[in-house]
């Protein structure tokens, strides 16, 4: 038995274990499956709270020091005078101590492994707690820390108990030797930096403390020491075997027996008992402390993310008299994971991974995850058609896997290893001195999590190059758990250490021939000689801010090429932290906002959801692209559609198809049809469509699939899929619009004034701009109607460019270098003409920078007898400048409309390369809802393919994109945080005839596909505008 050390704190610290890669722990207990130590089978079967497991979460005492050497020896037995109360779990940076640091690649400390700075912030935690005398007499008492960042020493009642590092896996210690009846005292010294920090260089906030649960666990003297269950299925998946191994510990285990029982809906499905002593292993014998049983199961209910059917497995340890000593339990899902014929399969079916990467992040609590937030994440993922999650880039809170088992998500469980900032990246992976530390991070993860059916892939870590240590760990995992594939992206995504080709940010059709680690196009990669593995992108579609363009292109490739089996979007949640400004107002902060250096600014804002889990518009794009139903318009007369189910295992029995036929948003007919579709089958539906009278407008068939009843992860009437088609309509000839009076032109010294009844337009003769429009005596413009060729840069436009590190290839730098953000108009022509039935104003502008013309814009404005302003605009773009972000017009309107209505794509923000989720229809939204509150302000709020826009007295018609905003493009460009934006008078109207895509294959290189770049050098557009 371990004997607690009487050494003083200073002597223990003098060894500097935190700078020795060969020391990852002292006296930490071996890894095993999670324990609860129930006293009876009924409680274990019901997963009730166990009386032998006691939470130590709550208020602890805390003292903060700049370095561990500053901590007085006396602290191990008594609190320091400056101690304050702090919650556990928490990150101390979120409690007002020290500084959170956000950095992506660059290490937050000087790179000199295994050494860390002498200034090493240190948190000293203490807690007094009570222990019942019966606990001490009846067995062993352990303490379990589920997560401490980055390393810690533990004392109990003044005696040193051990040391541990690896922030993301449990550390468990036996306290039995030093506990006493009544009051006891824990003291935990936590270091911000240790040599393990060189293995934890993930793209995230760097924070410290006891950030996961702490608990006391009581085990009887003889107890279950580990358990492992493996499901085996026959070729027809209608018979199964559950292979179970249990390990025991304690002096009397040889006299004991374990009963293993499989339960389903409260009933025993299979049971078996065995005494310890495995079969003969080798010439030296067997495992005396282990036992194995096999439970046969006929017609098992199979687990998948679609049908998360679970059984409950209990392990009851009894002594020689039949008394229960210890009970453990876990959920079991019968499923088989394999790679065959180049495809990743579950239960014999090739998967299409609809995945997302997820960091454990909470805006107020940092890296502390509560159950409600975990459940909310899963519910949102399921509602938006995700079926998989990658635990990027470390093992998650233990509860996460249980919830994934029960809700149904496929999981990639990833080891807490990333050395992205090393040069070369593989430096530690090829160093045998670091093998023990890397090994523990992989092996302990597998031993903790291997009973979870949701985990279908193990990952050796992230962005650590490729080295011999990876090859060794790959072999260990494959030997220890041959039931799951292993993936690892480092070294080029297709090394011998991965069963899956798992690149990050490879593009559909474009090669990226980087030296040493090329990224081939996806279509090319799967066709390369001797490459037979499935390809699943471990990261793709970088969702940073206003991004996610081209996502539909990936999904077209996934659906057309079976070995392209999907991928994991980067990433789930914006990693912003809540901070208060000088006035006490909360805002979401990113890198640098805490004075943290180094920092990577807003690069932590890559989420599909905001920090509070409000969706970004990109989330709806993912939902539509990934939907589990596909539709085909078979014929229009009769009106017939096919609905195909992409579900592999689930019979559709909770879905209803609801359809309507609408003309310009007005519903002409509607109906609903119950769906009963077997997996991967099709249901044909004939829709009773009425005869359409000739009338203005387009006719659209809209179909939605809704879940009629609530599920574990969605409310009733949740829409899970949709589609629409434009239907042929009778030819309609619109009658001519008859005006009541012709407009009148007056040529004045400074303006061309056009009048029509209660309206007047002023075209400034010096600038050529429409500077004012009076309607019923009210001025409606605050700023003139002007050409608009730029946008407030998106994150994807900026790329990695910074003030101190310019990337000349970034779109924004190319636009700046060309002078496109510094344009000055030169008027070449401004003339008016009175016609018999109308007035025309013709202008020609050269938009110049440094004396060079970049754009020529010719506008012909016509005001007709109905008082409608018609615009006809021709734009020429200089041949030697980069393609512009937009071609359109902008003005500041005097009114601030409450709402806006439009006929076009909506209701949510959409851009030319991100509009799969947008639907043709008539939409009405409040003005504020037309703005997307990205934390880092950029151009936002566009609605594409608009035919009609109405707000206040204004009505525009044509074929254009638009945005309405309280914020000018200049303010959006100049402001660093959304909370600093100030609403401007009136509102800004942007009318775009052409708008470049947002891109999103990645956010550090130009990624807008060629078809969404404004390649043409001559463009023309027209629209009409009237006021009532």
Curated annotation (Swiss-Prot):
Any one Gene Ontology cellular component term annotated for this protein: beta-galactosidase complex
Annotated binding of substrate, by residue: 104, 203, 463, 539-542, 606, 1004
The encoding gene: lacZ
Protein name per UniProt: Beta-galactosidase
Residues binding Na(+), per UniProt: 203, 603, 606
GO biological process terms held by the UniProt record: lactose catabolic process
Alphabetized InterPro entries for the sequence: B-gal_small/dom_5, Bact_Beta-galactosidase, Beta-gal/glucu_dom_sf, Gal_mutarotase_sf_dom, Galactose-bd-like_sf, GH-type_carb-bd, Glyco_hydro_2, Glyco_hydro_2_AS
Enzyme class at the top of the EC tree: hydrolase
Keywords: Glycosidase, Hydrolase, Magnesium, Metal-binding, Sodium
SMART domains recorded: Bgal_small_N
Named cofactor requirement(s): Mg(2+); Na(+)
Entry annotated with the keyword Transport: no
Family in the record: Belongs to the glycosyl hydrolase 2 family.
EC number: 3.2.1.23
Any one GO molecular-function label of the UniProt entry: carbohydrate binding
Textual note on the cofactor: Binds 2 magnesium ions per monomer.
Catalysed reactions, semicolon-separated: Hydrolysis of terminal non-reducing beta-D-galactose residues in beta-D-galactosides
Site label Transition state stabilizer, positions: 359, 393
Species of provenance: Enterobacter sp. (strain 638)
Pfam families reported in the protein's UniProt record: Bgal_small_N, Glyco_hydro_2, Glyco_hydro_2_C, Glyco_hydro_2_N, LacZ_4
Positions bound to Mg(2+) 2: 599
Binding site for Mg(2+) 1: 418, 420, 463
Transmembrane segments: none
Subunit-level organization: Homotetramer.
Catalytic residues as annotated in Swiss-Prot or TrEMBL: 463 (proton donor), 539 (nucleophile)
UniProt feature coiled coil, ranges: none
């Amino acid at each position: 038995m371990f004997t607690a050390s009487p050494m003083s704190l200073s002597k223990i610290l003098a060894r500097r274990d935190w700078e020795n890669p060969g020391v990852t722990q002292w006296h930490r207990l071996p890894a095993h499956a999670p324990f609860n130590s129930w006293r009876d089978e009924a409680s274990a079967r019901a997963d009730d709270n166990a009386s032998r497991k006691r939470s130590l979460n709550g208020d602890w005492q805390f003292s903060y020091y700049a370095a561990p050497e500053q901590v007085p020896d006396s602290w191990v037995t008594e609190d320091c005078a400056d101690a304050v109360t702090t919650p556990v779990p928490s990150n101390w940076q979120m409690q007002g101590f020290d500084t959170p640091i956000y950095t992506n690649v660059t290490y937050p400390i000087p790179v000199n492994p295994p050494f860390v700075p002498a200034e090493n912030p240190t948190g000293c935690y203490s807690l007094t707690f009570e222990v019942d005398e019966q606990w001490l007499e009846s067995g062993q008492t352990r303490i379990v820390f589920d997560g401490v960042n980055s390393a810690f020493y533990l004392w109990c009642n003044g005696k040193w108990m051990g040391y541990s590092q690896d922030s993301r896996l449990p550390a468990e210690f036996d306290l039995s030797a030093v506990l006493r009846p009544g009051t006891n005292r824990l003291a935990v010294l936590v270091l911000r930096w240790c040599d393990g920090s060189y293995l934890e260089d993930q793209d995230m906030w760097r924070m410290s403390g006891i950030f996961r649960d702490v608990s006391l666990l009581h085990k009887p003297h003889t107890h279950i020491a580990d358990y492992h269950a493996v499901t085996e299925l026959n070729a027809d998946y209608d018979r199964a075997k559950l292979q179970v191994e249990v390990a025991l510990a304690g002096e009397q285990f040889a006299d004991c027996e374990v009963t293993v029982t499989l339960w389903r809906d409260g009933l025993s499905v299979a049971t078996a008992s065995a005494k310890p002593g495995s079969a003969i292993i080798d010439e030296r014998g067997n495992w005396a402390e282990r036992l194995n049983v096999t439970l046969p199961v006929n017609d098992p209910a199979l687990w998948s993310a679609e049908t998360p059917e679970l059984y409950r497995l209990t392990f009851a340890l009894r002594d020689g008299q039949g008394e229960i000593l210890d009970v453990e339990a876990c959920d079991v899902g019968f499923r088989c994971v394999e790679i065959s014929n180049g495809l990743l399969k579950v239960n014999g079916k090739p998967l299409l991974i609809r995945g997302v990467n997820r960091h454990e992040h909470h805006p107020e609590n940092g890296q502390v995850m509560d159950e409600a937030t975990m459940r909310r994440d899963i519910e949102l993922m399921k509602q938006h058609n995700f079926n998989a999650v990658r635990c990027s880039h470390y093992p998650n809170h233990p509860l996460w896997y249980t919830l994934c088992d029960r809700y149904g998500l496929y999981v990639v469980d990833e080891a807490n290893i990333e050395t992205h900032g090393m040069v070369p990246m593989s430096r530690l992976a090829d160093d045998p001195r670091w093998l023990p530390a890397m090994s523990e991070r992989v092996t302990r993860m597998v031993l903790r999590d291997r009973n979870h059916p949701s985990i279908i892939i193990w990952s050796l870590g992230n962005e650590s190059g490729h080295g011999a240590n990876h090859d060794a760990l790959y072999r260990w995992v494959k030997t220890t758990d041959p039931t799951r594939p292993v993936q690892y992206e480092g070294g080029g995504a297709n090394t011998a250490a991965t069963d899956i080709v798992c690149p990050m940010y490879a593009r559909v059709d474009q090669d990226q021939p980087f030296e040493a680690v090329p990224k081939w196009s996806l279509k090319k990669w799967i066709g390369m000689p001797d490459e037979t593995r499935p390809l699943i992108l471990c990261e793709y579609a970088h969702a940073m801010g206003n991004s996610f363009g081209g996502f539909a292109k990936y999904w077209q490739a996934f659906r057309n090429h079976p070995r392209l089996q999907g991928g994991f979007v980067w990433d789930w949640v914006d990693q912003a932290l809540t901070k208060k400004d000088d006035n006490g107002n909360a805002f979401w902060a990113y890198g640098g906002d805490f004075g943290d250096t180094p920092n990577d600014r807003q690069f932590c804002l890559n989420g599909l959801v905001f920090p509070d889990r409000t969706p970004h518009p990109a989330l709806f794009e993912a939902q539509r692209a990934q939907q589990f139903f596909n539709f085909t318009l078979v014929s229009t007369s009769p009106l017939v559609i096919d609905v195909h189910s992409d579900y592999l295992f689930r019979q559709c029995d909770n879905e209803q198809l609801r359809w309507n036929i609408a003309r310009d948003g007005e519903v002409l007919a509607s109906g609903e049809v119950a769906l009963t579709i077997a997996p991967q089958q099709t249901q044909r539906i004939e829709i009773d469509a009425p005869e359409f009278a000739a009338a203005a407008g387009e006719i659209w068939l809209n179909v939605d699939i809704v879940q009629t009843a609530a599920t574990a992860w969605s409310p009733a009437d949740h829409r899970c899929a949709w589609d629409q088609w434009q239907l042929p309509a009778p030819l309609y000839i619109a009658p001519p619009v008859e005006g009541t009076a012709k407009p009148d032109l007056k040529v004045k010294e400074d303006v061309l004034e056009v009048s029509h009844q209660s309206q007047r337009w002023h075209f400034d003769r010096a600038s050529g701009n429409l500077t004012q429009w009076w309607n019923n005596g009210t001025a409606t413009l605050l700023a003139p109607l002007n050409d608009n060729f730029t946008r407030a840069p998106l994150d994807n436009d900026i790329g990695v460019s910074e003030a101190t590190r310019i990337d000349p290839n970034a779109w924004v730098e190319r636009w700046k270098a060309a002078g496109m953000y510094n344009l000055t108009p030169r008027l070449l022509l401004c003339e008016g003409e009175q016609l018999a039935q109308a007035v025309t104003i013709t202008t020609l502008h050269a938009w110049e920078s440094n004396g060079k013309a970049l754009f020529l814009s010719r506008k012909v404005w016509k005001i007709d007898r109905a008082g409608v302003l018609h615009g006809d605009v021709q734009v020429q773009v200089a041949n030697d400048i980069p393609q512009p972000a937009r071609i359109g017009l902008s003005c500041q309107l005097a009114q601030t409309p409450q709402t806006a209505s439009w006929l076009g794509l909506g209701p949510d923000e959409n851009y030319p390369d991100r509009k799969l989720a947008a639907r043709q229809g008539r939409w009405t939204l409040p003005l504020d809802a037309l703005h997307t509150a990205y934390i880092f302000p950029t151009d936002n709020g566009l609605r594409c393919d608009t035919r009609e826009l109405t707000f206040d007295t204004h009505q525009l018609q044509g074929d254009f994109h638009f945005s309405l905003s309280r914020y000018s493009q200049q303010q959006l460009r100049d402001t660093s945080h959304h909370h600093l934006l100030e609403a401007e008078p009136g509102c800004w109207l942007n009318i775009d005839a052409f708008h470049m895509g947002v891109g999103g294959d990645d956010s550090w290189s130009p990624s807008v596909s060629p078809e969404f770049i404004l390649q043409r050098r001559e463009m023309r557009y027209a629209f009409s505008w009237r006021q009532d």
